[in-house]
Curated annotation (Swiss-Prot):
This is Uncharacterized response regulatory protein VV1_0503. Gene3D superfamilies: 3.40.50.2300, LytTr DNA-binding domain. Residues 3-116 form the Response regulatory domain. It comes from the Bacteria. PROSITE patterns: HTH_LYTTR, RESPONSE_REGULATORY. It comes from Vibrio vulnificus (strain CMCP6). NCBIfam families: PRK11697.1. GO terms for cellular component: cytosol; protein-DNA complex. One of its GO terms (molecular function) is transcription cis-regulatory region binding.
Length: 242
């Protein structure tokens, strides 16, 4: 039996879809979320086999959430959409499934059957990844009991520690459910250390230390370590040959 997560900002839609999925006997709904930010957190925590994802949600859409998922651990995704026939055709052309609101029980059963018979997770993931945005314009974060949507261009660095991944701008630091790998691949942040990414435009100076190590000082005075492995690449990106 496949496990599923339902993400939709409409409570009735979540409840109705959860009931319909339970009635199929092939899906165990292990959670739901009212927005994409909480949804991403639950995807990382619960690791469902399938995510039924609404497209039109406030702040972060379903399409944007798709681009925030780690491609190495991405679940099956089925869009739940009220889009018109032209948009639906576009999803079909990409060999990607969808459910049209209001969800038709028979159509849902066909979707579940198709998922159950999927030849491999990797094959479907390739279709999912092909629809994901190549870059992220915003990063959903949680800080001080509030949801923060941080513009990617305002971020000076991102780093991970025992408590998770954190994103820092000139004005604030907040936690995100996105991995450093996703941030590295889909933003302009550059790897400078196993646990740190840096924005080139945020660099004020680089202090060269002993043993081939270095330390970046950002324009706001934040200190970011640079490992030997990434120092040469960083110099090249700054136009320094030595």
């Amino acid at each position: 039996m496949l496990t599923a997560l339902v993400i939709d900002d409409e409570p009735f839609a979540r409840e109705e879809l959860t009931d319909l999925l339970s009635e199929t006997g092939d899906i165990d709904v292990i959670g739901d979320a009212a927005n994409a930010i909480v949804g991403l957190k639950k995807i990382n925590e619960l690791k469902p086999d399938v995510v039924f994802l609404d497209i039109q949600m406030p702040q972060v859409t379903g399409i944007e959430l798709l681009g925030m998922m780690d491609p190495d651990t991405m679940p099956y995704v089925v869009f739940v959409t009220a889009y018109d026939q032209y948009a639906i055709q576009a999803f079909e052309d990409n060999a990607f499934d969808y459910l049209l609101k209001p969800v038709d029980p028979e159509r849902l059963r066909k979707t579940v059957k198709r998922l159950s018979k999927a030849a491999s997770h990797s094959a479907l993931s390739q279709h999912i990844a092909s629809l994901a945005p190549e870059t992220l314009d915003q990063i959903p974060c949680i800080g001080h009991n509030r949801i923060v949507i941080m513009a990617t261009e305002s971020v000076e660095c991102a780093y991970s520690d025992i408590s998770g991944v954190h994103v820092r701008s000139a004005s604030q630091t907040a936690s995100t459910q996105l991995t450093l790998k996703v941030l590295e691949e889909k933003t302009s942040l550059v790897r400078c250390h196993r646990q740190y990414l840096i924005s080139i435009k945020a660099i004020s100076e680089i202090k060269l230390l002993e043993n081939g190590l270095a330390e970046i000082i950002t324009k706001t005075g934040f200190e970011v370590p640079v490992s030997r492995r990434y120092l040469k690449l960083l110099k090249e990106m700054l136009g320094l040959s030595h």
